[in-house]
Amino acid sequence: MKLAALLGLCVALSCSSAAAFLVGSAKPVAQPVAALESAAEAGAGTLANPLGTLNPLKLLLSSLGIPVNHLIEGSQKCVAELGPQAVGAVKALKALLGALTVFG
């Protein structure tokens, strides 16, 4: 059971990382004409991605009984209090831990 939870966590983290990479590396497209822009905004609600709200990490944590909303609120408070320098340090630490787990 623990192995399945670990595998699910690894898949969820890799999916989130891959999605963040793809979103960050996407090239900006040309701006639509002003007349089409309002139509695009009106249709955005009807054509929303049904899987856009599906977050595998949230599903995994909530299936394990971990309160996800409480974790999200706490992390948002920490980020707001610490500022951008601390966020950069946490990202660097996360990258270092990721490298250690790959080579360790």
Curated annotation (Swiss-Prot):
Tissues with expression: Highly expressed in lung and prostate. Also found in mammary gland, spleen, pancreas, testis and liver. Detected throughout the airway epithelium in lung, with highest expression in large airways. Found in lung submucosal glands where it localizes to acinar and ductile cells. Not detected in respiratory bronchioles, alveolar ducts or alveolar epithelium. In mammary gland, specifically localizes to luminal epithelial cells.
Compartments it resides in: Secreted
Signal peptide: 1-20
Gene Ontology terms: biological process: negative regulation of cell growth; positive regulation of myoblast fusion; regulation of cell population proliferation
Keywords per UniProt: Cytokine, Disulfide bond, Secreted, Signal
Pfam families for this protein: SCGB3A
Gene Ontology MF, one: cytokine activity
Chief place where the protein resides: secreted
Alphabetical list of InterPro entries matching this protein: Secretoglobin_3A
One GO CC term on file: extracellular space
Function of the molecule: Secreted cytokine-like protein. Inhibits cell growth in vitro.
Family: Belongs to the secretoglobin family. UGRP subfamily.
Subunit structure, as described in the record: Homodimer; disulfide-linked.
Protein name as annotated: Secretoglobin family 3A member 1
Lineage: Eukaryota, Metazoa, Chordata, Craniata, Vertebrata
Gene behind this protein: SCGB3A1
